[in-house]
């Protein structure tokens, strides 16, 4: 597509220089929880058909498409100044500025977009500015499909990948579209938009970073737990905790980290003080370079939804809420997964059953290698010894019995 620079004025009368993509184009947008087909002309959204798992995912896809369309009513919907920066403190380019702005709050964007009456089409419904479904009216040009979007795309599909700089490339690596003209030296890493890569968690803003970080910990809890007790430094340095740091107020990062690491060390030292939920909750804070200080905290602040919200060191909060009855974690009201082990019950019952057939010889003995999880014990041969991590974070040395006790 032909690109030319245009100066546009936001609703706050700030001048933005954007590169306008001219001519008709069709895109297939694929996120992890929503897909969409966008047809657009120069600075105009012609049609957006979106399908997604829930209201939030659909809203996120609509915001991306509206920004991508470069329509004037989107630019005029900006309230306040755009001054988002990346981690190196450089201003983001205008298209990213707009994206971040509306990902934080899209109310004005949706209100100003305009609505239109819709025809009744099988499998399609309308969506109103407050993101509720409707069969009579819809945001201009926008429709929600209940069945997915594949059948609405035209036949010739170009397979493209979108990297974390919002550059669109074809299979040969040619840049088809980008927010800035790209010199090829900028690297050609290829990240499609599934958010399994932690580098991409940020694209959907702070809430996505928060939820994705905790989901990652829960999904990998078995290995995280072992690293937590055996090799915490390696765990703290994992890149999955990188995006989270941008949510923690700069001045507090080092203090929080020092505080949490000390707390964790006490848990490791004092038998029986291992608390799964608390470890999961505080772990991302331990990733920053720690400052040694005597500071104690009862709550830690994260910047989401445009303001600081608190995570309580002990107990639940709207940001991080663990439900003992359902064993599920919700982060900012979104489900972040289930804990397979029960953190509070002291998993003694399960473990004594699992450890039947093993003799507990005493405390951990480093000569027998790193601690195994309960699940890995089944691989031991009779008479073989191993360290094993039992529920409350204690590591003990066991030996598989030579003969099965009946």
From Swiss-Prot:
Localization annotation: Virion; Host nucleus; Host mitochondrion
Entries under InterPro entries matching the protein: Flu_PB2_6th, Flu_PB2_C, Flu_PB2_CAP-bd, PDB2_C
GO biological process: 7-methylguanosine mRNA capping; cap snatching; DNA-templated transcription; symbiont-mediated suppression of host cytoplasmic pattern recognition receptor signaling pathway via inhibition of MAVS activity; symbiont-mediated suppression of host gene expression; symbiont-mediated suppression of host mRNA transcription via inhibition of RNA polymerase II activity
Molecular function in Gene Ontology: RNA binding
GO CC annotation terms, alphabetical: host cell mitochondrion; host cell nucleus; virion component
Keyword NADP: no
Family to which this protein belongs: Belongs to the influenza viruses PB2 family.
Annotated protein name in UniProt: Polymerase basic protein 2
Annotated organism of origin: Influenza A virus (strain A/Chicken/Hong Kong/FY150/2001 H5N1 genotype D)
